[in-house]
């Protein structure tokens, strides 16, 4: 596909002042931005240099069901605001391309408010003469049942169209789709052939720029770069780009999705000669590395989404690209929630004084938690180590949760690393802690619930209450199975 360049009907330079548009205070806080501005001013009128704003993993519509409605709505507003900071920056700088590398939405069926919001931002980009390119991600691309190809390969048929397709049909962006996004291939041979994606080529002030978009879906296996052609229309372009959404070997991945088995191998990147640049999403931390003759830039997320996210500041990337290398590559941070973590070894909570009650243990945790809790903080409290059930039940988790709800934006309590010691397996030691002599029992919410429920049922004063407690136990266990 070939798309002619857009002629700007105005005299403003392609790249305005970062200090003017990004703020003098921010420039003073980050000297690298001022250095970047000098580089941009040097190259902004040079033929052969294209400017790009790259963003990914915006996760619009993300819904933390554990939070109250007011905070859920505020969270959605924060996600939209972060994405708008990227589009506003692109418009202010008058860039050539705005590229979105997957997971624009957190769902395949975003609500009308998020859809309308994105439509407005895309309209503004188009009005500014900026070309917008996008690919789907793991969260905003749905799949149906896979069908076998050639006895080994798998092709995925999409049950519902990706939400970005509606914008593409209106001409607001170019959306790279797999063939199965639009229709089922009539036979396996054609389906296999259609896996090789067609590049789109742009003319930017006389410079030919070719782009291919590629993303993985849940259940896909292998290295997605194997589906790229060895030769294509990219052979005749000056600058070749791959817009990618996939796990990359060697990059930290802590996805909540268990069905991600595809991975781009670094050797595949090093051995390919088709792309000078790979602009990627999926990983939530910004990265810029050189692999072979290729520059790999990972945009990172525009907000912290999960507590497993890296500590890096969220943002987007501002790029100046040429055939012979990068002219500038700047990660621009956005306003975001702060991600903070507190690890508490539970052995430190086990009282040496037998008169110590649960209030002292809980207050001990709150005292450690207090400095981290602010209105703009996502805080994870992680309990680790070995303790008895008795000591565990002396921790008032509800009180800690209520404190978190009041003093920080969100609080998560992770006790998956707690191990229970049975009373029979504890031998009193001189320091009063006790030590395990045989085995440790891993904490399980389901088993803990069953044990507590059985205690209550056994202590029930009559048969009617025992039956009621038994029914409640079964309902809770059923709910746990679906969590």
Residue ranges and their predicted role:
Residues 54, 100, 134, 242, ...:
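Structural beta-sheet core signal
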């Amino acid at each position: 596909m070939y798309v002619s360049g857009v002629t700007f009907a105005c005299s403003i330079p392609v790249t305005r002042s970062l200090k003017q548009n990004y703020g003098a205070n921010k420039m003073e806080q980050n000297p690298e931005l001022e250095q970047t501005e000098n580089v941009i001013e040097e190259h902004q009128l040079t033929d052969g240099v294209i400017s790009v704003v790259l963003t990914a993993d915006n996760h619009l519509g993300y819904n933390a069901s554990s939070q109250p409605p007011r905070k859920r709505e505020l969270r959605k507003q924060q996600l939209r605001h972060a994405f708008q900071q990227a589009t506003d920056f692109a418009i202010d700088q008058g860039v050539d391309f705005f590229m979105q590398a997957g997971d624009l939405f957190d769902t395949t069926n975003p609500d009308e408010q998020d859809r309308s919001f994105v439509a407005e931002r895309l309209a503004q980009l188009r009005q500014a003469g900026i070309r917008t390119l996008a690919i789907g991600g793991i969260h905003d691309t749905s799949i149906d049942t896979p069908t076998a190809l050639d006895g080994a390969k798998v092709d995925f048929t999409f049950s519902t169209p990706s939400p970005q397709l509606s914008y593409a049909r209106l001409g607001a962006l170019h959306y790279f789709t797999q063939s199965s996004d639009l229709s089922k291939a009539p036979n396996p041979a054609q389906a296999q052939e259609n896996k090789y994606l067609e590049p789109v080529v742009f003319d930017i002030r006389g410079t030919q720029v070719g782009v291919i978009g590629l993303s993985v879906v849940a259940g896909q296996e292998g290295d997605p770069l194997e589906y790229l052609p060895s030769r294509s229309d990219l052979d005749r372009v000056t600058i070749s780009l791959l817009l990618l959404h996939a796990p990359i070997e060697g990059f930290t991945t802590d996805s909540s999705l268990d069905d991600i088995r595809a991975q781009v191998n670094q050797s595949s990147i090093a051995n390919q000669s088709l792309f000078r640049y790979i602009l990627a999403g999926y990983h939530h931390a910004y990265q810029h590395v050189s692999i072979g003759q290729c520059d790999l830039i990972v945009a990172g997320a525009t907000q912290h989404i999960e507590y497993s996210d890296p500590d890096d500041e969220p943002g987007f990337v501002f790029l100046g690209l040429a055939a012979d290398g990068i002219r500038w590559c700047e990660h621009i941070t956005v306003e975001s929630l702060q991600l903070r973590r507190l690890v508490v070894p539970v052995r430190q909570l086990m009282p040496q004084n037998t008169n110590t009650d649960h209030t002292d243990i809980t207050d001990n945790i709150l005292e450690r938690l207090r400095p981290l809790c602010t209105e703009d903080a996502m805080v994870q409290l992680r309990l680790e180590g070995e303790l008895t059930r008795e000591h565990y039940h002396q921790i008032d988790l509800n009180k800690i949760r209520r404190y978190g709800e009041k003093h920080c934006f969100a609080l998560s309590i992770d006790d998956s690393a707690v191990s229970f010691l049975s009373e029979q397996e504890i031998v009193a030691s001189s320091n009063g802690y006790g030590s395990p002599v045989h085995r440790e029992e891993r904490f399980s919410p389901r088993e803990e619930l069953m044990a507590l429920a059985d205690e209550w049922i056994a202590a029930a004063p009559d048969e009617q209450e025992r039956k009621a407690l038994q029914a409640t136990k079964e309902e809770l266990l059923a709910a746990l199975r679906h969590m």
